[in-house]
Amino acid sequence: MRNRAYTISPSLIPNEMKRNGLKPIEANQTRLTADERALVTAAKKARLRAHAHQSQFKVGAAARYGNEIVLGCNVESDSYGLTNCAERTAVFSAHASGIARKGLRMIAVIADSPEPVSPCGACRQVLFEQGGPDLRVIMCNTRGDVRVATLAELLPGGFRLETTPPRRAAAVAKPRKATKRGPADAP
């Protein structure tokens, strides 16, 4: 039996996107607001700081918290599993600098890819927890293609601890008491 390569006809892609609730790729950024264009520009600058010595795939992100923009870039590790994505770097930087309390309003992400780059599953989960299902995600590539979606479109049914059954949530939130043997975390 011969292996066959299958391709998807480009004419089917818009229908597939429509079925999944994604907006079509814009050929340019003219449909973005001035605030969104500023966020994309900031993400482009952040991309230049990426440390992608393993993959050479540099990604930049810019997150809007109130009136402030927090930058993030991917930082790769020789132990590839320890690599941190641009989107999570931006979110974690916002927490480290105390800006996260202003609330995540939107995020832009950009890479040199054939299609606008989309956050990975781990980033989608973190963004869902930080910005909620209505968070606006602006996905771009360096060619100027843009796709805009909400987190609910990218991560339907996103997980939050508060959505777990009350008994389980209480058990998770309840700290363990110290015993005579030692502190709560002792074996």
Identify the function of each model-found stretch.
Residues 8-49, 102-187:
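C-terminal binding/interaction regions
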Residues 74-89:
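Compact, glycine-rich, soluble single-domain proteins
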Residues 54-65:
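Short beta-strand scaffold segments in enzyme catalytic cores
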Residues 96-101:
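Phosphate/pyrophosphate-binding loops at sites that engage ATP/ADP/AMP, CoA/4′-phosphopantetheine
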Residues 42-45, 86-94:
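Short, well-ordered amphipathic alpha-helical segments that serve as non-catalytic structural scaffolds
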Residues 3-6:
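Intrinsic-disorder-associated, low-complexity terminal segments enriched in Asp/Asn/His/Tyr and depleted
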Residues 65-68, 141-143:
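Short acidic-glycine loop/turn motifs at beta-strand connectors
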Residues 66-77, 103-106:
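Glycine/charged-rich beta-loop-alpha catalytic/anionic-binding loops adjacent to active sites
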